[in-house]
């Protein structure tokens, strides 16, 4: 989606990196744009020439990698001067407790979201689409300092809440999304 959107907004060329061949195949099936190049590799392995890109975008991927600071250094190198780095991750409050499940009473009502071992960064195992996946919990400090210590200035940090229309349309599902942040959106610029 992001690749197609970038081309629609006037990007001359777009490079997409993903480890999953299935995700790449689905992306390729949605467009035949010659402006989009799809590469299968771990995101940590990117090694593009310096000043190759004006913008780097990532959606919900960095909580699957161990070294955010190391990745920031690589992204900074391949961005042109003043280039933008925009990404989303699962919020550190959401990833702190590996189970990523609400604590409930005997009737199944959500009591609270568990936040434990927040400052203990590292591997967490969570269920995702019926499978156990490995994620790397990082603190908010780790994300912000990973940027600042690798040549970026922070432009905006957003903890999104459900839109009012979603709250009205799906009150049973969405009301709990106001009780804890699930996502973190970040916009930074290369210094």
What are these regions (language model features)?
Residues 1-46:
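Class I SAM-dependent methyltransferase SAM/SAH-binding core
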Residues 54-69:
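A short SAM/SAH-binding and catalytic strip from SAM-dependent methyltransferases
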Residues 89-100, 127-142:
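Acceptor-substrate binding/catalytic loop of class I
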């Amino acid at each position: 989606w992001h690749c197609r959107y970038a081309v629609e907004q006037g990007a001359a060329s777009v490079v997409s990196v993903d480890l999953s061949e299935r995700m790449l195949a689905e992306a390729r099936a949605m467009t035949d744009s010659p402006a989009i190049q799809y590469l299968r590799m771990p995101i940590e392995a990117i090694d593009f020439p310096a000043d190759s890109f004006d913008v780097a975008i990532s959606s919900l991927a960095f909580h699957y990698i161990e070294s955010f600071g190391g990745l920031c250094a690589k992204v900074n190198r391949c961005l042109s001067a003043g280039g933008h780095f925009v990404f989303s991750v699962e919020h550190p409050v959401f990833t702190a407790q590996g189970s990523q499940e609400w604590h409930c009473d005997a009737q199944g009502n959500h009591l609270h979201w568990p936040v434990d071992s927040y400052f203990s960064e590292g591997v967490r195992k969570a269920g995702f689409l019926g499978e156990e996946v490995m994620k790397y919990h990082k603190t908010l400090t780790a994300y912000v300092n990973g940027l600042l210590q690798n040549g970026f200035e922070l432009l905006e940090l957003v903890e999104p809440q459900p839109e009012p229309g979603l709250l009205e349309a799906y009150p049973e599902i969405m009301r709990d999304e106001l009780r804890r942040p699930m996502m973190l959106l970040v916009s930074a610029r290369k210094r």
